From Swiss-Prot:
This is Hydroxypyruvate/pyruvate aldolase. Its EC number is 4.1.2.-. GO terms for molecular function: aldehyde-lyase activity; metal ion binding. It catalyses: D-glyceraldehyde + pyruvate = 2-dehydro-3-deoxy-L-galactonate; 2-dehydro-3-deoxy-D-gluconate = D-glyceraldehyde + pyruvate. The record marks R73 as: Transition state stabilizer. It holds the Pfam family HpcH_HpaI. Keywords: Lyase, Metal-binding, Pyruvate. The keyword Lyase applies. SUPFAM superfamilies: Phosphoenolpyruvate/pyruvate domain. InterPro entries: Aldolase/citrate-lyase_domain, HpcH-HpaI_aldolase, Pyrv/PenolPyrv_kinase-like_dom, Pyrv_kinase-like_dom_sf. The lineage of its organism: Bacteria, Pseudomonadati, Pseudomonadota, Alphaproteobacteria, Hyphomicrobiales. The active site is at H48. One of its GO terms (cellular component) is cytoplasm.
Amino acid sequence: MPAPENRFKTAIHAGKPQIGLWLDMGEAITAEIAGTAGFDWLVIDGEHGPNDLRSIIDQLRALATSPAEPVVRVPVGESWMIKQLLDAGARTLLVPMVDSAEQASDLVSAMHYPPRGIRGMGAAVARASAFNTIADYADSASDGVCLLVQAETRAAINDLDNILAVEGVDGVFIGPADLAADMGYLGRIDEPEVQAVIEAAIVKIVAAGKAAGILTFNEAYNRRYLELGASFVAVGADVTEFANTLRALSARYKGGSAPQPSRSGY
């Protein structure tokens, strides 16, 4: 029996738009609720969310029967961390701050068993192989894993052609907030120069046959990115949706107006 199909990977390779949500509360119950909301993918955020390996596993369990595919964002692209998360049952990993093709190539290697990569054996005692009940797991694991790298600096944009040429990179995710900050526009993704770079990057990613992704809290931007061919677009986060809804509810009964949320995301 091979490893189960990664629906998210299949969809983005087919160019089918996937709408997602960020999970930053670090709670399994929140993930479980989000899994009923109709999103195609949900990011368990290990970079900015209050997560560790155990809380990530709890959220993976909570989403096990959900139609939404979990994507785990690692805090940093270290091979040992990637190995742990893959063994824990994560199949799609999002890696922040990938600035070069060399970094991307190293990440691809960390995702796969030898001879293709350097992933250490050990899934037989972990969730990934259903605790050794998926007999062909090691042989089929590569088919199910999906690597998304984040381009969120000028260095990454400058090396984007080479990053896109790395076999085994399934998609490139543009980090608009960090990119804007690196370009000198801290907290200002609305700047025309920033938007021009983002749009050009999406077009380039799609033209190279890779999946393009992004997160913003701005509906107009998100629809524009989908028009340009972005295939995995996150449109909100659990923390902000929860906070904004509560503030609006309170304001409706107590008078006044709720604080205006950021449109950019992160």
